[in-house]
Amino acid sequence: MKYIIIGLGNYGSVLAEELSALGHEVIGVDTNERRVDVLKDKIATSFIIDATDEQSLSVLPLKDVDVVIVAIGENFGASI
């Protein structure tokens, strides 16, 4: 399966690594460059974008994935 995980903090990063280790294609998204850098060699693709900005989200292949997981925990409003 193909996943997009938005938010690569504690939960999102572990989930991304585990899904990738199971053979799934994982696209990771976060605003924090350091978080993206840590995972860039462990997952298929990564983006440094603000997922709360609709225009930024347009670069993601949303129509080509099976599941999108929003793992933003710091700001409840951003996860909606």
Where are the regions a protein language model picked out?
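Cytosolic regulatory regions of ion transport systems
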Residues: 1-80
